[in-house]
Every structure is written in structure tokens, then in C-alpha cells.
Amino acid sequence: GAYIKSDNAADNNLAASTYKLPLTMLWYEKIANGEVSPTQEFEFTENMLEKEDEENPNQPIGAKYKVGDKIPLSNLLEAAALYSDNIAGHILFENLGGYSAFKHMATKYSEHQQSKDFFNENKLNPDYTMDLVRHLYETSGTYDDLKYWLTYAGPHMFLNYNNPHGYVQKVGNNEEIRNVIGYAPTLYPFSVCIYSQIGDKEGEKLIGDIGDICWAYFEQKYNNGDYEMYDSSLAESRMAIGSPQVALAYLPDLPVDQRSTLEHPHGKTNS
């Protein structure tokens, strides 16, 4: 399909929590390949502690577990994908050999060559993430549970600001940084990647407007017959998402705009 990118698509940007998308993909791939069980437990050690995230408070791993506890992989993946939990992310990449080792593993999702700071710092670039999201979308089965969590993470945020559950997205925010990578699970699939220092609420609304513009544009192309050569049966299989067990108890003091759980289709939680 068509690929439109900005002139700086190869430039690395501060990734914020978008790094958790390739991280969780690697683990779901390991599960699918039988290399690890979702019930396998990983120890929460002191070096995995993360400072409190003021923009994403009440992250469940720090609230439910203490240093020394062992946490099932499935809980860590739920926390990292649905809540963007920083401790979960740290535990997951440490158990791949550390952050740099994880980033080297994750290069397989793109044919683009990466610079040194890609591996040593929390940075990503649109050339990489567009390939990453395409792989996520086109791979049926392996990532269905991950697609589920990403569908219900922040339904009124970023690309989904005006269109709850429209995009399957992973967001990243830290101070003025507002990043998002995602795709539209439709009969006219397309992906969007934005790395910005656009600011807080006004930036998030602007990203939502961009999401709406892209959606309308590709919907119009579909209505005009521009997708006639695309196999719609492929789209239907790739639109599938899983139905994983909800393991983490939702926290009642979570801000309303972060209560993905209120629109959760299953509505059941286990403490």
C-alpha cells in the first residue's frame, strides 16, 4: 500500500511509553512459539522500581506487588499494554537481558538500519514504528490478546480522542511529549505514527483531530473504490482481537479519562 512519511521519519525521538509496543510483541511472540508460558512468574527486584508517573498515576504493579514478589507474565503484559505500567515494562525488558538487548531483538520488526542511540536510549523513529505497526496488524493470532489490550487502553485519548476504540494504539506521554503509534482495524486499513513535543491537553486534542482526518480520508478512498484490489477477507482476519482473562483489579481512584475498564466489554475482574 501507499506509504507517506515526513522528511524526518528516520530521526530518533524520545519514545516515552511507545517502547512498550515492541517489548510486549516480543513476549507475545515467545508465548506463541512455546518458548514461555503466560503463567511463568518473574521476580520483582529492587532495581526494577520506577519513580511514580505523575501523568499516569496508580499503575497496578506498584500498587499490587512489592519488591520480592513473583508476578505472572500474563499480568505483566496486561499491565504494560493496558495501563502502560512502567515497572511492568522494566521487568519485561530486564528478563530479555536488559534494555539494549531488548532493542536489538526488536530490530527484526523493521528492515531499516538503526543508529547507536536507538539501542542505548529510549528512542524510536517513525521509519521503525510504521514497520512495527504493519507487522502487528498483518500477523493474525500471535498478538490478538495484545490488540485487545491496546483497543481498550485509554478509549478517549490521542487518536481515539473523538472516536473511542477506533484505533488500536500505543501512546506515550511525558511532560510536553505526546506520541502515538497505531492502526485502524477496518476494511480500509491504515496506520498512523506521531512523535511530537506538542504539549498536554491541547496536543492530545490535536492528535485526535489528526486521527479523525486520516480516518475520513481513507474511508473516502474506500468508498471511491481505491481498495478494490485489497483482499477484504484478509482484513477481517487481521481485525480479530483476543479475549484475555482480566487479572489485575482496577483501581477505583483512577482518573475518569483513564478508566478504560468502565467501557470494558467483559466487565469482570479478579483481585
Regions found by a protein language model. Give the residues of each.
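Short, well-structured active-site flanking segments
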Residues: 29-52, 142-147
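Active-site SXXK
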Residues: 13-42, 80, 192
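N-terminal carbohydrate-binding/catalytic regions of secreted carbohydrate-active enzymes
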Residues: 1-4, 21
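Active-site-adjacent helix/loop patches that line small-molecule binding or acyl-intermediate pockets
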Residues: 46-47, 56-144
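Short, hydrophobic/aromatic-rich segments at coil-to-beta transitions
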Residues: 163-170
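Structured C-terminal helix/loop/strand segments within mature extracytoplasmic catalytic/sensor domains
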Residues: 3-4, 11-12, 100, 137-154, ...
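Structural recognition of the beta-strand scaffold that forms the well-ordered cores
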Residues: 16, 79, 91, 113-115, ...
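Extracytoplasmic
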Residues: 8-10, 14-19, 37-39, 87, ...
